[in-house]
């Protein structure tokens, strides 16, 4: 067993990195009465000041910011869609190669390390990492959108394709459109995003548990940069990680605010406008701040567990009350459709469905990549003692299957309402309202819609609270117990960035910043793949897994 006094200490054989660097040696430590700061002098100052300037400029010049964000998103996705799609394919292929190679025998934490959590608890945490505001927002809207686009078929104007259907569409064929729509949805929520998370989580766990380096992004690059990783190259990597995580979280928080606003409008007739979204962000950020100030980590964890239970109960309700047989058979047929269409959906070149590849896929991959430091660090923390093979198989499959089930239940039900009953309220509603419109066709709609709002709000709180911890760890040079005021700063600015983006263009601005920060961090992750392989090759491997 590992030394309980040092949970990061390796167990058994490892090949640690010999470095004189001490965690926090470059930090500025300030103590003022009961308060204090312990910040990395360059990472915190540069990223913190940049975020402050961004928020101020975007709020003050929000009318000028809106067209800027729209053009920025359009340029990045239309010119770099091939890059994002290719990068995501590389992450999947790397995971598959590591699973079947001898490197899969390397154990995180040392050859004798034992898991900190049993399978059930570990799988539950992986499942929890896959749930969030995104599934609540897109669980109904994305399958419906792809189904409708595919059913409408292709259209051209001056020889240029103008429709949003994935691949070649399925003009007029409802069954084929449903299969293609669900396959396209699952493509965005299954193996590819979880491969992105898995690669970074593996790197963080390997270089922390096995190599004895700080739990921060720069540590992953030690095999390539050596001691320079503690200088400016490492500073840049950590600063990019802070930006990516902050804007990735802000995108999710903005989506959550728009959906909560739509739900409150549906239930209570409250205004569904920008002001309401801003008020929701302020209110929920204040709740997250209270949890940070009061040290309610245990309470937030408990709240997250309750939320997961509520999500499971809501899903079970839809399965039982909705088209049960169609949902259960659809889960299998949707997986089959996903595997059938996967090669074409993942093809980065010669695509005719430019709107789908650029407007959906490129955005998603950039968004997932910007989320990767947040989710990757969480997965790394709970995966000590697992072999690389066990780790990758579980991280790829368990959350992917959970996401497929969620999309099959909510998206499949919405599609069946259209096809079997001609109920098109959900399909014609605005994106944030589509979940509530789908629930409105079922019994106890007021109750289930209220539960859905609670789910969105609590996912918002837990994401903000946990995200501030991850950002603070990076900006504190790898220290995991930095002073509370630092987390207050990051938690506050997660909300302020979301507000700035809502004022600066809403969904378009949120997506623009996710893509903008995701692009440079994609380059960081691609280089990290090389570092991870080099790190694994230097590790001792037991004869048996």
Question: Where are these predicted regions, by residue range?
Answer:
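Hydrophobic membrane-spanning alpha-helices of multi-pass integral membrane proteins
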Residues: 47-55, 284, 398-402, 486-502, ...
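Membrane-embedded translocation segments of transport machinery
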Residues: 229, 233-389, 393, 398-450, ...
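N-terminal alpha-helical transmembrane segments of multi-pass membrane transport
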Residues: 2-165, 175-177, 293, 316, ...
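C-terminal membrane-solvent junction of multi-pass transporters and transport-like membrane proteins
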Residues: 39-43, 105-124, 325, 329, ...
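Helix-loop-helix module between adjacent transmembrane segments
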Residues: 15, 35-45, 49-59, 92-95, ...
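Hydrophobic alpha-helical segments of multi-pass membrane transport proteins
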Residues: 50, 83-100, 311-322, 402-412, ...
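Flexible loop linkers connecting adjacent transmembrane helices
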Residues: 27-33, 67-73, 101-119, 144-170, ...
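Membrane-water interface regions at transmembrane-helix termini and the short interhelical loops
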Residues: 31-36, 61-76, 96-116, 180-188, ...
């Amino acid at each position: 067993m590992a030394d309980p006094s040092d949970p990061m200490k390796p167990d058994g054989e490892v090949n640690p990195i010999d470095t004189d660097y001490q965690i926090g040696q470059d930090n500025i430590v300030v103590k003022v009465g009961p308060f204090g700061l312990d910040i990395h002098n360059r990472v915190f100052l540069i990223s913190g000041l940049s975020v402050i300037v961004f928020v101020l400029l975007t709020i003050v010049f929000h009318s000028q910011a809106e067209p800027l964000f729209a053009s920025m998103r359009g340029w990045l996705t239309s010119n770099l869609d091939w890059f994002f799609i290719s990068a995501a394919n590389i992450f999947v292929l790397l995971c598959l190669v590591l699973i079947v190679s001898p490197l899969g025998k390397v154990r995180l934490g040392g050859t004798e390390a034992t898991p900190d959590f049993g399978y059930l608890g570990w799988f539950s945490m992986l499942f929890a990492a896959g749930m969030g505001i995104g599934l609540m927002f897109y669980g109904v809207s994305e399958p419906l959108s792809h189904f409708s686009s595919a059913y409408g078929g292709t259209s051209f104007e001056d020889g240029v394709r103008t429709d949003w259907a994935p691949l070649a569409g399925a003009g007029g064929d409802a069954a084929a459109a449903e299969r293609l729509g669900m396959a396209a949805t699952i493509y965005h929520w299954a193996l590819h995003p979880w491969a992105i998370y898995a690669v970074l989580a593996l790197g963080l766990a390997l270089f922390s548990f096995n190599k004895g380096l700080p739990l921060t992004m720069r540590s992953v690059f030690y095999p390539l940069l050596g001691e320079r990783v503690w200088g400016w190259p490492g500073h840049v990597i950590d600063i990019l990680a802070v930006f990516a995580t902050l804007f990735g979280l802000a995108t999710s928080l903005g989506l959550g605010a728009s959906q909560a606003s739509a739900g409150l409008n549906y239930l209570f007739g409250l205004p569904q406008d920008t002001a309401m979204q801003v008020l929701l962000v302020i209110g929920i950020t204040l709740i997250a701040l209270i949890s940070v100030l009061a040290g309610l980590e245990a309470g937030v964890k408990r709240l997250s567990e309750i939320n997961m239970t509520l999500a499971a109960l809501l899903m079970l309700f839809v399965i039982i009350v909705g088209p049960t047989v169609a949902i259960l058979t659809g889960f299998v047929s949707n997986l089959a459709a996903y595997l059938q269409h996967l090669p074409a959906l993942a093809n980065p070149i010669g695509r005719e469905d430019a709107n789908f590849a650029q407007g959906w896929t490129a955005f998603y991959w950039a968004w997932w990549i910007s989320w990767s430091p947040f989710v990757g660090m969480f997965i790394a923390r709970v995966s000590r003692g697992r072999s690389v093979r066990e780790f990758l198989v579980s991280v790829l499959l368990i959350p992917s299957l959970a996401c497929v089930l969620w999309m099959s239940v909510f998206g499949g039900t919405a599609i069946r309402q259209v096809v079997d009953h001609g109920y098109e309220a959900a399909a014609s509603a605005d994106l944030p309202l589509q979940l509530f419109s789908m629930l409105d066709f079922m019994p106890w709609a007021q109750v289930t819609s209220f539960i859905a709002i609670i789910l969105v709000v609590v996912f918002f709180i837990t994401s903000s609270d946990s995200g501030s911890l991850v950002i603070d760890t990076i900006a504190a040079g790898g220290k995991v117990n930095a002073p509370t005021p630092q987390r207050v700063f990051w938690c506050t600015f997660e909300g302020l960035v979301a507000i700035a983006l809502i004022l600066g263009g809403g969904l378009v601005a949120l997506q623009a910043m996710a893509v903008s920060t995701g692009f440079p961090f994609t380059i960081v992750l691609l280089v990290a793949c090389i570092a991870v392989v080099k790190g694994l090759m230097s590790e001792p491997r037991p004869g048996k897994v």
